[in-house]
């Protein structure tokens, strides 16, 4: 999935996907779209009685997705992957600065996906504050910093990585 993410909108709008969704969606009260945000608005026009939910979406796209939810009455919500971090898919959310460091090739002892708004121990990560701001639930700023050892470098990351920022003023 990570390799196709840059073309996700094109794939979502492919005629084969359209035909499959037309058949499957006809028998559903609510149709869940995984990583197909590009279909939310046009499918509302094509199928005026269809109710859509973003059943799995990329965390960095929350501002785009939530704008669609607020503007389109037929889109009833968005479920970002994922709220709470978990064991498995080790490293999918780990940004890397050298080939072979993060993502799905993260080295041992990496066991967490590292994609949750809440980490495995129950602490909120910066992404959760960004989401809170997008939802209009937070007006105060939330300030994060990047590790200065990577200053000026562009991370290699999967589409599930928002950033490598953290809420701290000290660095190890």
How should these model regions be labeled?
Residues 1-172:
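Substrate-binding clefts and catalytic carboxylate motifs of secreted carbohydrate-active enzymes
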